[in-house]
Regions:
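Non-catalytic terminal regions of proteins
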Residues: 59-62
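Sequence contexts marking disulfide-bonded cysteines in secreted/extracellular proteins
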Residues: 40-47, 105-107, 141-143, 151
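Long, well-structured alpha-helical subdomains associated
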Residues: 109, 125-152
């Protein structure tokens, strides 16, 4: 992937989300799916293709081709929105070994996902296409006293 492509996708995320452009772009790191299963999904099978876990890195699965696939580029835009959310909270400048300066609440995590999926859908629509991204979020809610969203 080219830095120009990532800069353009970050620009889409800024434009569609309303967040200000960050002083520094994220570092896009390409990873195999096993990384996402282990790190993002707590070693459980999952369909995660992109992940932002705080800091400066945005992780994208190695099978995605954002240069030639609208769906793949929309995933990068989605993760760029999460980076912008992190920058807005100050999570792009972290102490070593921590993902977030302050762990987001369950409700905040769900709100961020809704926001990122809304931007992803709008990005896809601007290209004249419809892909039903984010529908799994309809069944996600917070259990009382839980820090993590649950899907039912």
């Amino acid at each position: 992937m080219t830095p120009d492509l990532y800069a353009a996708l970050l620009s889409w995320a800024v434009t569609l989300s309303g967040y200000p452009a960050p002083a520094e772009p994220p570092v896009v790191v390409i990873k195999q799916h096993a990384f996402f299963v282990l790190e993002a999904c707590n070693d459980q099978p999952c369909k995660v293709l992109g992940w932002y876990s705080g800091g400066k890195n945005v992780y994208i699965e190695d099978t995605l081709d954002p240069e030639n696939s609208l769906f793949a580029s929309s995933i990068v835009v989605h993760e760029m929105v999460h980076y912008l959310q992190g920058v807005a909270r100050g999570d792009d400048a972290l102490k070593p070994g921590v993902a977030f300066n302050q762990a987001p609440s369950c409700e905040q995590s769900i709100q961020w996902e809704h926001e990122a999926y809304a931007v992803q859908r709008e990005y896809i629509l601007r290209y004249g296409a419809f892909l039903p991204v984010g529908s799994s979020m309809l069944h996600v809610h917070c259990e009382p006293g839980s820090a993590n969203p649950e899907q039912h």
